[in-house]
Amino acid sequence: VLALAPRRGPRSTKFSSGQVAIAGGSRGLTGAVRMASLAAIRAGAGYATVAVPADLETVFEIAQPEVMSVGCPGGDGCLVPASEKAVLRTFERAAAGIFGPGLGKDPGSFELARSVVAKIEAPLVIDADGLNAFAGRLGELASRSAPTILTPHAGELGRLLEKDPDEIGAHRLASAREAAREAGAVVVLKGDDTIVTDGTRVAVNAISAPALATAGTGDVLSGMTAALLARGLEPFAAACAAVIAHARAGREAATRVGAPESVIAGDVIDSIPPAIRPDGPVE
């Protein structure tokens, strides 16, 4: 499935290679947006822009010269309804986007999420607290005009479906399918046997990567997924390709640093280039 992604050619530009927009970040959680945006670029997006709280924008300007930033007004270290216009402008030219990394649980951030996600016209990956904003309100996502990919772990999916995480764990495929159908989305239920489903088609990851059991790797997966969407893959294929490449990158990172337990999310990002190639390591 990685071979389906368009490759860069002599006439490619940073814009034709796929623009990704990302909204999120809050005080104490700026790293999530940084990792998602760097992963998107490493996975082939030609241009990435982050919409972040204005009072935290300096963090991104200093730490991430490869990524454009838009400071969104309104909140005290978080995105809130007053940030909506700036967020929507950031997504206007995006070929794909991500909403939620590092968003935080401020009620205003959740209110923004429920308003702005419906208005974003680009294919969208929703992750982390972007998902939690729709706890018990999953059906609201079905009104989106563009494709949606949800990337929950069992706890987040439990909140979306208002079910105990243990029940999700006992019925992973059925739960993922239920969520996909209710939201009209592709669901990536994360785990060692990550499941990808659009409610009808199903794919299950068979590449074990214990190194991915560390903070930030979910943000890396979101970035990779958005990049493959921006490069032109349809949502189910983009999700499958990202899951495969993410697992490969986790294994590559463990080999490079010497032990799965020593891998950090940045190591996984650095391992994306060989993992994303169609002729990359085969498990």
PLM regions with names:
Residues V1-L124, A128, N132-I149, A154-E283:
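Small-residue (G/A/S/T)-rich helix-start motifs and N-terminal tracts that mark the onset
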